[in-house]
From Swiss-Prot:
PANTHER family to which the protein is assigned, alphabetical: ATP SYNTHASE SUBUNIT B (PTHR33445:SF1), ATP SYNTHASE SUBUNIT B', CHLOROPLASTIC (PTHR33445)
Name of a matching Pfam family: ATP-synt_B
Summary of subunit composition and partner proteins: F-type ATPases have 2 components, F(1) - the catalytic core - and F(0) - the membrane proton channel. F(1) has five subunits: alpha(3), beta(3), gamma(1), delta(1), epsilon(1). F(0) has three main subunits: a(1), b(2) and c(10-14). The alpha and beta chains form an alternating ring which encloses part of the gamma chain. F(1) is attached to F(0) by a central stalk formed by the gamma and epsilon chains, while a peripheral stalk is formed by the delta and b chains.
SUPFAM superfamilies for this protein: F1F0 ATP synthase subunit B, membrane domain
HAMAP family linked: ATP_synth_b_bprime (MF_01398)
Keyword annotations of the record: ATP synthesis, Cell inner membrane, Cell membrane, CF(0), Hydrogen ion transport, Ion transport, Membrane, Transmembrane, Transmembrane helix, Transport
Native source species: Pseudothermotoga lettingae (strain ATCC BAA-301 / DSM 14385 / NBRC 107922 / TMO)
Biological function: F(1)F(0) ATP synthase produces ATP from ADP in the presence of a proton or sodium gradient. F-type ATPases consist of two structural domains, F(1) containing the extramembraneous catalytic core and F(0) containing the membrane proton channel, linked together by a central stalk and a peripheral stalk. During catalysis, ATP synthesis in the catalytic domain of F(1) is coupled via a rotary mechanism of the central stalk subunits to proton translocation. Component of the F(0) channel, it forms part of the peripheral stalk, linking F(1) to F(0).
Designated name of the protein: ATP synthase subunit b
Family (UniProt): Belongs to the ATPase B chain family.
Length: 162
């Protein structure tokens, strides 16, 4: 019987071992595998999410870079346009100043010409008066030759001084 006992003990031990394996599998190993699977799925999900966010961040970075370049080009265009407008304004001011200077110069020339004509008319008038006065004196015979010259020189000197 010792042999059978041993055999029965071995079978009971084997049966206890199998029950223990079943209990361990059911209550420890299977939940552990489920937790490990969930953990693996979460890690994969987090990795996929991180890759997606990285791609989005790179796209946003590219968009920001493009927007910055566009803003730079726009600013350069605005600055260039402002420079051109300022040059146009300066050129217009120069042209206007030249025109004004020409007007002032022409006005001054016209005024000088008018005063010159007036002076010539005044000289002609005076010369006529002098000639008449001189002729009267000569006709009257009042002046002798020397007095006539002195009188004439006197009158001409006075006219030059005016």
């Amino acid at each position: 019987m010792g042999f059978v006992e041993l055999n029965l003990t071995g079978i009971i031990q084997l049966l206890n071992f199998l029950i223990l394996l079943f209990v361990l599998y059911k209550f420890l190993y299977k939940p552990f595998l489920q937790i490990a699977d969930k953990r693996r799925e979460k890690i994969q999900s987090d990795l996929a999410s991180a890759e997606k966010e990285l791609k989005e961040a790179q796209e946003m970075k590219k968009q920001a870079h493009d927007a910055l370049e566009s803003a730079r080009k726009s600013a350069d265009g605005i600055i260039s346009e402002a420079r051109q407008k300022s040059e146009e304004i300066i050129n217009q001011a120069k042209v206007k100043a030249r025109e004004e200077a020409e007007k002032v110069l022409n006005s001054a020339r016209n005024e000088i010409e008018r005063e010159k004509k007036q002076a010539l008319q005044e000289i002609e008038k005076r010369a006529g008066e002098i000639a008449v006065t001189l002729a009267l004196k000569i006709l009257q015979g009042v002046l002798d030759e020397k007095a006539k010259r002195e009188y004439l020189i006197n009158i001409l000197n006075k006219e030059k001084e005016k």
